[in-house]
């Protein structure tokens, strides 16, 4: 593919040049080619976007619930019509296999938008009787202008997960995509405008997180920030948001999630789940079950089943329908994952497979890392303690239920957890003791629109998706009505 035209900001219904004068490049990680030069938003651009959003939000909030719902449904239709086109762009920008982006990324994002478009008329207040002559009623009112800051692994899906409930509740959103994968968020802005969204209600500001992101989190005109990314960055976003104007925050941060296989489990099922929990999207999923706990007596058989399934991984041309494994998102990220792999070897974990870059003409110019499985791991190893965000599985053994629950919870993270067992009593008993916000029994990874997702501990604050997220983009106003004559003590 030839190099794309220089990408601008999207403010008030159209593309516009950044006043900062700064640019950055976005790279195709499959081959190292530059896809496009992208303009970076500066402080003045953030000010422009906020003013635009404030104007648009008033128009948007004044529409009826059904009017807003129809516009968002039109956007859903356009997204589905252009699924393949958007998936191709997402594959170029992220390196993910087209077999994945064409069936997951846009599809699941559009599902969430459709879900919230349908919920808009159901955003109701309540009426609370006090006595015969008095009652209270409540209203869910929009926050105003909110900011979304996305991660690089699911660019358009995250943009939709954040914008759908925000817009459904009557807010305007300024979205900053990751500078690593900024392209599809700009296309989403065009789609929203085409669907009839008033100018300014969804603005997109590409830029570097330490600059553009910081300007957004500090801006007094922003009422809430929804952030997806790493823990360290999340802490900075939260601190800036609180220090500037006590903004509300939603944080979807990192994870080091446990997958517990019990001795009564079907090991074929367990191996299938472990593969999806570690190598889907080349391991670049925040909920990955990278700590795989297996009973000691089942370890050898389980390892053989994993090795057999690794042979089914097909890396190569990301547009080949048979490819199910792509490069990592960038060369700096590849190098970081390789440092973790080297650390695992240094600390005594045994490499069952992988452990290096993929080699060959198809891979030499890209950010490719081989699917890697470590075994004979211990809880104190760096690869077991820290989030790697790559195709690296760690296998650990255990002896008892109480032991594995304790060890599974022995982490600062609490995003996800899963168990594989034939005993449903055990399944519920154990899941209720795991310190994680998203849990799966005999499955892994699905996050439908109806399901609230978010973490415990350092893995985040608040939730995305589900009814409660729509409500979190509103502020509740309570109004008391008195029908009798008011009595003053003065």
Swiss-Prot record:
Active-site residues, Swiss-Prot/TrEMBL: 162 (charge relay system), 252 (proton acceptor), 286 (nucleophile), 464 (charge relay system)
Disulfide bond entries: none
Chain positions recorded as K(+) 2 binding sites: 246, 457, 460
Cofactor: K(+)
PROSITE patterns linked to this entry: ALDEHYDE_DEHYDR_CYS, ALDEHYDE_DEHYDR_GLU
Binding site for NAD(+): 150-152, 176-179, 230-233, 254, 286, 387
Cofactor binding: number and manner: Binds 2 potassium ions per subunit.
Keyword terms, alphabetized: Metal-binding, NAD, NADP, Oxidation, Oxidoreductase, Potassium
Keyword presence, Transport: no
Enzyme class: oxidoreductase
Domain of life: Bacteria
Cysteine sulfenic acid (-SOH) modification, residue list: 286
Biological processes per GO annotation: glycine betaine biosynthetic process from choline
Pfam families assigned to the protein according to its UniProt record, in alphabetical order: Aldedh
E.C. number: 1.2.1.8
UniProt-annotated site: Seems to be a necessary countercharge to the potassium cations, residues: 248
Alphabetized GO MF terms: betaine-aldehyde dehydrogenase (NAD+) activity; metal ion binding
Binding annotation for K(+) 1: 26-27, 93, 180
Catalysis performed (reactions): betaine aldehyde + NAD(+) + H2O = glycine betaine + NADH + 2 H(+)
InterPro entries, alphabetized: Ald_DH/histidinol_DH (IPR016161), Ald_DH_C (IPR016163), Ald_DH_CS_CYS (IPR016160), Ald_DH_CS_GLU (IPR029510), Ald_DH_N (IPR016162), Aldehyde_DH_dom (IPR015590), BADH (IPR011264)
Pathway(s) it belongs to: Amine and polyamine biosynthesis; betaine biosynthesis via choline pathway; betaine from betaine aldehyde: step 1/1
PANTHER family reported in the protein's UniProt record: ALDEHYDE DEHYDROGENASE-RELATED
Role according to the record: Involved in the biosynthesis of the osmoprotectant glycine betaine. Catalyzes the irreversible oxidation of betaine aldehyde to the corresponding acid.
Family from the record: Belongs to the aldehyde dehydrogenase family.
Subunit structure, interactors included: Dimer of dimers.
The protein's name: Betaine aldehyde dehydrogenase
Organism: Escherichia coli O7:K1 (strain IAI39 / ExPEC)
